[in-house]
């Protein structure tokens, strides 16, 4: 092969490589654009479906919108973290009655749903969903920091230690073995623990933007100091 032929061959190889690289970069950019488009779509939809006024002061707007989408369109957090089916929806807004859906803002994520004695009938504690709204500090879920909130979703730890493991016969306040009283029961944290940090942060940001619900008087675990 002559030097001229070698040069032409090398040039052809370089051109093919350049085309391949350009194609790869274009594919990556398209994927990034598609993902950004999906993210923006979720953010917009999140604001559209938020059932309560949002306080965006000092908040990351994009995270609040994404958090609303996750909480209201994917996770159905209010389905458990409201006082129950009877008060989850506003009058005339129960979709199960064939009515246009309207969430009750007075109970939205304020907790209070009683799942009954756990693990079943007997002298066992009632599992009641927690109040997820922010308190007077502006921090959601009883004033927990983001790191604490993330730890709850990742590990299921019950930072309030409401129902410890029984050290003797069940008395209605403790959980019988083999249930671990350090962990939240019923809450599907084993599923939530697989969420990305970005999504968990978005949920936290959204919960910090919703109105505070005071709930029943202290010392109820559902009580929030709103002012």
Label each residue range with its predicted role.
Residues 45, 87-122, 161-178, 222-226:
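Surface-exposed intrinsically disordered loops and tails
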Residues 11-24:
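Hydrophobic membrane-insertion alpha-helices, especially the h-region
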Residues 42-72:
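Electrostatic cytochrome c docking/interface patches
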Residues 28-41:
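Ser/Thr/Pro/Gly-rich low-complexity linker/stalk segments immediately outside membranes or between
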Residues 75, 96-152, 160-161, 189-200:
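Electron-transfer interface patches adjacent to heme c in soluble/periplasmic c-type cytochromes
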Residues 60-100:
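Sequence/structural segment immediately N-terminal to covalent heme-attachment motifs in c-type
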Residues 69-76, 82, 154-158, 205-212:
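Sec-exported extracytoplasmic/periplasmic mature domains
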Residues 2-14:
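N-terminal Sec-pathway targeting helices
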């Amino acid at each position: 092969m002559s030097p001229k032929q070698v040069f032409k061959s090398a040039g052809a190889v370089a051109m093919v490589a350049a085309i391949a690289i350009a194609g790869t970069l274009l594919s990556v950019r398209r994927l990034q654009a598609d993902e950004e488009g999906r993210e923006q779509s979720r953010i917009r939809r999140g604001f559209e479906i938020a059932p309560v006024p949002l306080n965006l002061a000092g908040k990351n707007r994009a995270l609040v919108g994404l958090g609303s989408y996750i909480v209201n369109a994917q996770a159905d957090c209010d389905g458990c973290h409201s006082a129950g089916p009877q008060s989850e929806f506003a009058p005339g807004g129960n979709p199960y009655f064939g009515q246009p859906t309207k969430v009750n803002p007075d109970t939205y994520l304020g907790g209070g749903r009683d799942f009954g004695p756990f693990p079943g009938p007997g002298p066992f504690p009632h599992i009641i969903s927690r109040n997820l709204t922010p308190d007077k500090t502006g921090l959601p879920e009883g004033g927990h920091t983001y790191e604490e909130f993330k730890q709850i979703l990742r590990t299921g730890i019950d930072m309030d230690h409401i129902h410890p493991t029984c050290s003797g016969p069940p008395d209605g306040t403790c959980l019988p073995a083999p249930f671990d009283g350090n962990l939240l029961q019923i809450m599907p944290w084993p599923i939530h623990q697989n969420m990305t940090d970005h999504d968990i942060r978005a949920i936290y940001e959204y919960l910090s933007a919703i109105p505070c619900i005071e709930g029943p008087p202290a010392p109820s675990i559902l009580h929030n100091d709103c002012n």
